[in-house]
C-alpha cells in the first residue's frame, strides 16, 4: 500500500504534450488516501482547483500516499496537507491537464482534443445543443461518449447509464464537467445525486463545469464510496437540488460560463417535499406529440396570451395551423408541463374573467434578474440563460442570479407587472450565506397566485400605456420656476429640466405650451405682483396638483391664487346664501386665495377647488374693472394736468388695485412710450429684449413681461387705440420720413403755419420724447369708416375684416354704419352728421400738425374759421 509503484506512463502531462498512449487509471481496490474534508476553500480558478481534485481522487499514480502525504509528479514537492498540495499545483503547474478521449457515438468520431469535438459538432451537428456526455473507462483510458439527448417536459435531459465490461464507472455516481482545459472529475455517491449542467456552445466551443466539494471517508468506508452532500465555497456556480432517483443522473439544459450563475426561479415548498422523487417524462414518449408545433408562431402567440385555450379556440387554431385538434391539445398540455403551469379550474376561470374584463392586458412576462457585474459580459449570455415565464398572472415571483461563492435559493421576490414597461426597477433581495444542501428547498416556477405582492418593486412608465402621468410637486416646482424666467425655453433649458425632473422633452414642451395657452386665453389674466413673490403657483392641470390636508398646508403659507386658470370659465351650480356669505367674507379679508384659505373654504362651503377659484377670479376681475373705471374718471377730471394717453385699457390692466396687494407704482409717460414702441415692433420680445427694456426703462422685468401679456390680450380684443398711431410713426421713421416736415391738407405751398397763440416767439421746441403722449389724437371708428366710404362709396366684403380691426368695431356695427349711409343717400339727406365731420377734421388737423418756429404769420385753423363763419351768419 505504502510502496510507490513505478510507471513509465505518466498520468498527467503538460497541455503542449499530446501522447495517445497516456491513460487514466482508477484503482479503487487500494483505497483512497486519507483526506481532510475541504470546507470554505479558497475561490480560485475552477480549472486549477478541479485539476487537483481529479488528480487526487481519480489517479493514484499521480498522487500516491507517501507517509500520509502527497507528492508532485513533476517536481520534488511533498506535503501531507491537501490544501498545500492543491496550492502548489495551481501555482507551479497551471497547464497540467488530464488525458482523455472524446467519441461522438452518432458519427463514430474519435479525438483527443475537446476543441476538435466542438468543431465536429459545429460542422456535422449545426444548431444541435442537446448533447449528453457519458464518462467510461476502457483499456485504462478515460473516454467521453457524446450522444444526442431527448428533452423532457421540465426542460431537462435524461441521461442513460453506459457501462463497459465492469470497468466503466457508474454514471449516476459521476459528476461530469468540462471546461476549455478539459478536466474530468470522478465523484462517489453517498446519499443523493447532484443535478449537474452540461451545455455545449458550438459557437464558442465551450461548456460549463459544475463543481462539487469532495469528501473522502476513512478506510471503513472504502467499500461504499461516497460524496458529501454539502457544497464548499469553491463552487462558482449554483446547482438545482433534486432528490434521490435511482433511475440515473438528471442533467439540466442550461449551462453558464465561468463565474456566471444559473438563473433560478424559486419559491419555498414544503420541507418534506424533498422526500418525493421528481418524475421526468421524455417528450418522445407521447406518441401524438408533434415537435414541429414548437416553431409555429400562431400557437406560440396563443399560448403566450392564455395557456388554457377553450375548445372553440382549439378548433380555430386547428383550422389555421393545419394540425389536428388532438395534436394542438397535446401541444398545449406539454407546454404547460414544460413551463410548470398548473392551475385549478377555478383559477383558470378567474384568470380568463380578468383577461376579458380588462384586468389582464399583457402577454406573459419573461424576467431575468442578472447582477450588473456579469450582465455586461457577452460570452453567449442570451443563449444560455433559462428564464422564468409567468403566464397570465399579475404577480411575478423571481430570485436574482447568484454570484460567486453563494447559493441561489433565497426568499422569493414578488413584484407587480402591468403592461410591458419601458423602465422596470426590480428590487433584489440579498442572497444569504451558503447553506447546507439538506436545508435547500426545491424550486418551482410560475406560481398561479402569489400572496405577497409588493407594488413598489416595479416602477412602470405610464407613457407606454398612453396614460398621462401626474407630475409630482417637485417636477411642477421646477417647471414653474423655469416658466417664470422664460415662457419659451431654449434647448439647453429643456435638457436641464429633463435631467432634473425626469420628464421627456415632449412632456416639458407640452407643459410650457399649455401654460402659455391658458395664460393667453384666460379672462382673468391680470398680473398680481404679490410683493415680488415669485413662488406663486401656476396651476396648469388640476390633476397635477394633489390636495393637501389643512395641517400640511398651514406649514407652507405661500400665495397660490391662480392667475392662469387651467380651463375657460365654467357654469357652476348656484351657490347658497351661506356659501356666498363665507366666500364674500374671505374675499373682503384678502382677495388673494392661498392654499390654506382654499382648503378651509372647501371644508366649510363644500364647494370644489375649481368653483372657489373661479369665484375669486371673477371677483378680482370685477374689482379690477371698477378700479380702472374710477381711475379713468379721475384722470378725465384732471386732464389738463395729466396725459390722456396713460389710461389705455392695456396699461390699466397691468396693475389693478386690490386689497392686500400693496402700493403699485404707475408707469411714467416715457416708460409707456418705450413699451408701446417695443410692442409695435414685436408682440413677443425675446429674453434679451426683455432685459434691454428693463435696463432702459428702469422697470422690473416681471412688470414688463406682465405688461406685454396684458397688452397682447387687449390687442386681441380690440382695445388698443394707440397701436396704429405708433405703427404709422414707426413705419415713417423706418422709411426715413420722420425728419420731413408735414404740411396741412389743402394749404398752399407758399404758406407756412404760424405758431399757436400764447406761445412765446423764439422759444425752444419741445422734445419729441416729452411731446408725443400729449399730442396723440386718435381717429374714431366712424372716421375710419368715413374715409373708406368716401373712397369706395360702398362696403366691399373683402375689406370687412380690415375695417373691423382698424375701427375696433364689430362686424354688425360696421355693416349697420354702411347701411345707414346707404339709407341716407337714398333719402337725399346729409350722409354724415355735423359733429362727426368736425371731430374727423380735428383729428386730421392734429395728426398732421407739426409745430414750427419759422413762420411770422399765424391764422386760425380751418375748423375755427368755420365756427366763426357760422356765428357771423
Curated annotation (Swiss-Prot):
Q: Which cysteines are joined by disulfide bonds?
A: none
Inducers of expression: Not induced by gonadotropins.
Keywords for the protein's UniProt record, in alphabetical order: DNA-binding, Homeobox, Isopeptide bond, Metal-binding, Nucleus, Phosphoprotein, Repeat, Repressor, Transcription, Transcription regulation, Ubl conjugation, Zinc, Zinc-finger
Zinc fingers (C2H2-type), renumbered ranges? 70-93, 102-125
Q: Which CDD domains match?
A: homeodomain
Segments for region (Disordered): 1-63, 198-247, 430-455, 540-568, 627-664, 731-767, 829-873
Signal peptide bounds: none
* Segments of this protein annotated with the region Required for repressor activity: 831-873
According to its UniProt record, where is this protein located? Nucleus
Q: In which tissues is it expressed?
A: Ubiquitously expressed.
Skewed-composition ranges (Basic and acidic residues): 207-221
Record region (Required for interaction with NFYA): 272-564
Annotated region of DNA binding: 284-346, 464-526, 569-631, 660-722, 777-832
- Residues modified as Phosphothreonine are 36
* Residues joined by cross-link Glycyl lysine isopeptide (Lys-Gly) (interchain with G-Cter in SUMO2): 159, 441, 485, 629
State whether it acts alone or in a complex, and with which partners, per the record: Forms homodimers. Heterodimer (via HD1 domain) with ZHX2 (via HD1 domain). Also forms a heterodimer with ZHX3 which is a prerequisite for repressor activity. Interacts with ATF7IP and NFYA. Interacts (via homeobox domains) with DNMT3B (via PWWP domain).
**Function field:** Acts as a transcriptional repressor. Increases DNMT3B-mediated repressive transcriptional activity when DNMT3B is tethered to DNA. May link molecule between DNMT3B and other co-repressor proteins.
Q: Which family does it belong to?
A: Belongs to the ZHX family.
Protein's recorded name = Zinc fingers and homeoboxes protein 1
Q: Which source organism?
A: Rattus norvegicus
